[in-house]
Amino acid sequence: MMITRGWEGWGRRGARGAGTGTGLGGPGTPESSVTPPEFPLPPATRITPNFPNTLDPAISRSSS
């Protein structure tokens, strides 16, 4: 769960990051919320691209 809200805030996929990133990331910008100092989650960066469709298939197809 912490991973889910983590990559959402970062906006790694961009699709969800644009909206959800506003609350979690702060700036709301997908690229700007990639790695905010508020909650640095290094492991999430590597597992996010490994199972993006597992959490939300819409993110994977929207980002593509």
Curated annotation (Swiss-Prot):
<feature type="region of interest" description="Disordered">
    <location>
        <begin position="1"/>
        <end position="64"/>
    </location>
</feature>
<protein>
    <recommendedName>
        <fullName>Putative uncharacterized protein PRO2289</fullName>
    </recommendedName>
</protein>
<feature type="compositionally biased region" description="Gly residues">
    <location>
        <begin position="16"/>
        <end position="28"/>
    </location>
</feature>
